[in-house]
Amino acid sequence: MPFEIVFDGAKEFADLIDTASNLIDEAAFKIAEEGMSMRAMDPSRVVLLDLNLPASIFSKYDIDGEETVGVNMDHFKKVLKRGKGKDILVLRKGEENFLEITLEGTAKRTFRLPLIEVEELELDLPELPFTVRAVILGEVLKEAVKDASLVSDSIKFIAKENEFIMKAEGETQEVEIKLTLEDEGLLDLNVEEETKSAYGVSYLADMAKGIGKADEVVLRFGNEMPLQMDYPIRDEGRLTFLLAPRVEE
């Protein structure tokens, strides 16, 4: 099914694909009348990604029906990263088995990316009984993950009433990042019970790569449960990650 969709801000779209490409090698994007979506799992089956971009966030969204396009994420990322901040991104598909990517700025540059067959798995985003919901600034999360990487390959999230802690412990070193609602970096915190869970630092680093410093990131987790991380894309869109916990001995 032919389609043409236009996104004002090629770099923003490229950052989304760049983040996803750190975790998955290929993806099947569903282009439907209500919007563009993608759900995939990394090869190690540790992280589930769910991308939802409603038609309303595009400046033009023209499709009659539904189309699934499979792409090599590394190739897709490299093309998109050729766009500048103010470039307009146009994605088109005609009758041929190519995705046409046009970057409109000081010149109009068009790339043709061959589509590939991607196995579409039935992946559900489960409703889990999380006991914590924390909203933090993207900058805080990114810096905490960098701090933790100096000490350990895992980071522990600890939530108590009015307090959210990110902590990493190595053989000889440790680091603790403590936030309360009095701190600018913690925007909201709801804790049903004291909760602890640990996660892999390298996965969190990949998940946080595309987050802007001023973005609001929603973290949900429970005791030794997966971490659900959501961040909004132009208010109505959303990128969600579900990261399996590190079970500590």
UniProtKB/Swiss-Prot annotation:
HAMAP family from the UniProt entry: DNApol_clamp_arch (MF_00317)
PROSITE patterns, A to Z: PCNA_1
Organism domain of life: Archaea
Organism whose genome encodes this protein: Thermococcus sibiricus (strain DSM 12597 / MM 739)
InterPro entries attached to this UniProt entry: DNA_clamp_sf, Pr_cel_nuc_antig, Pr_cel_nuc_antig_C, Pr_cel_nuc_antig_CS, Pr_cel_nuc_antig_N
PANTHER family from the UniProt entry: PROLIFERATING CELL NUCLEAR ANTIGEN
Record-stated family: Belongs to the PCNA family.
Keywords, in A-Z order: DNA replication, DNA-binding
One Pfam entry name: PCNA_N
Coiled coil: none
Example GO BP: regulation of DNA replication
Protein name: DNA polymerase sliding clamp
One function term, GO molecular function aspect: DNA binding
